[in-house]
Amino acid sequence: MYTVNDFFCGCGGLGLGLQQAGFKILKAWDFDKFAVQTYRENIGDHVEQADIKELHIEDVPKATAWAFGFPCQDLSVAGKQAGIKLECTDCGEVWEVDYKNYTRGNACPKCGGENYRAATRSGMFFEIMRLLQEAGEKEPNKLPKILIAENVKALGPYLPVLAAEYGRAGYKSYY
């Protein structure tokens, strides 16, 4: 049986589909307490209200797959369309990920630092990449075999960025 951890699980749309496809969900997380309550009632008690930025690999059970529908508000036509932005934790500079000229290295354009966090909700994708990096460094047995991501159509221009990040982490991507 395939197992999965469900990040940014919301009310459980992706989780329900994964369950129906035969996956066993080990753990799910979302920031919104109402979404977590709905998930718990419809999918199961394996859900936890948490900020993904505060999770560490020690909090994540070993699973075959990680699924994540990271926030889309900054990409969606119904949202602010602010794009994916990062904030340097060394100097505080905020910058938009340049999907047209992306090469690995979200180095801060101001100080060159590579320590950053999401500055927009859609930048939370990079928190998954942080967790994968933590797994590789601290608990390689927790690296999932499969990554499943879903998002809105407006993510399209950023797909090469995601593909580059997946490749850097040792995964092939299909979109």
Q: How would you label these PLM feature ranges?
A:
Residues 1-175:
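Conserved active-site and SAM-binding loop architecture
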